């Protein structure tokens, strides 16, 4: 079997052209991270004879806290990478990239966290071998196809929505930079009071919206009352 080569990229200017359609592992998101204050992206690429067969993207996030340690860095990874050659075991490729990434960032990060794993057992052996441990989180699954939105809502929620509409509350897409900025500032103030919650830098949302303007894969919706933004998503 031909040897697999692992490369680490930290600079978007030298990123090669890579296959794939996954946003968490895309070159576009890599460059967005680069432009966001406090964010440093890392891309691990596995290749054979210069042909990419897998990639795994991570981001190192710098956090400033009120209590010691006042400055910490944590590495976050969404998913388990993207794979392009079915002749190789995804779990084995993941294990190689996981070990490489762990050795690369552990010396500078307080914590390495994987989120949005496809299954609870994927890569379990490799996680254990590299010193990772599972954390239980509440997962909520909503089917978007079995029932219409109106039928999925509880009667109490329907009454709340109808009452809000009656008093003039409106929902619309935030198309102007001013509306998006106002809403993001509102969210940031809400998250700032929650010690265990993190709100990403505002630039990250703005860059995501700009980069996906044509595809509309990242959109902001706002709720207004008397021409004042009171919520959104």
Task: Tell where the protein language model's regions lie, with residue ranges.
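A conserved beta-strand-loop-helix scaffold within acyl/acetyltransferase catalytic domains
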Residues: 2-65, 116-233
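Acyl-donor binding region in acyl/amide transferases
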Residues: 63-134
């Amino acid at each position: 079997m031909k040897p697999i080569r692992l490369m680490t990229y930290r600079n978007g200017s030298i990123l090669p052209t890579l296959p794939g359609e996954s946003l968490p592992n895309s070159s576009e998101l890599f460059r967005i991270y680069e432009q966001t204050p406090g964010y440093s992206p890392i891309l691990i690429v596995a290749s054979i004879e210069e042909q990419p067969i897998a990639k795994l993207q991570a981001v190192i996030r710098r956090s400033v806290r009120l209590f010691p340690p006042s400055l910490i860095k944590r590495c976050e990874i969404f998913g388990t990478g993207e794979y392009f050659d079915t002749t190789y075991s995804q779990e084995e490729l993941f294990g190689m990239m996981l070990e490489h990434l762990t050795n690369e960032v552990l010396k500078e990060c307080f914590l390495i966290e994987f989120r949005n794993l496809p299954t609870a057992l994927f890569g379990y052996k490799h996680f254990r071998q590299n010193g990772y441990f599972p954390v239980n989180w509440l997962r909520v699954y909503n089917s978007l196809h079995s029932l219409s939105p109106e039928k999925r809502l509880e009667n109490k929620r329907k009454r709340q929505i109808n009452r809000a509409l009656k008093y003039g509350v409106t929902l619309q897409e935030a198309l102007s930079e001013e509306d998006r900025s106002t809403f993001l500032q509102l969210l940031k103030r809400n998250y700032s009071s929650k010690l265990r919650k993190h709100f990403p830098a505002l630039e990250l949302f703005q860059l995501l919206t700009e980069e996906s303007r044509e595809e509309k894969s990242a959109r902001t919706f706002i709720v207004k009352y008397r021409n004042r933004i009171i919520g959104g998503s």
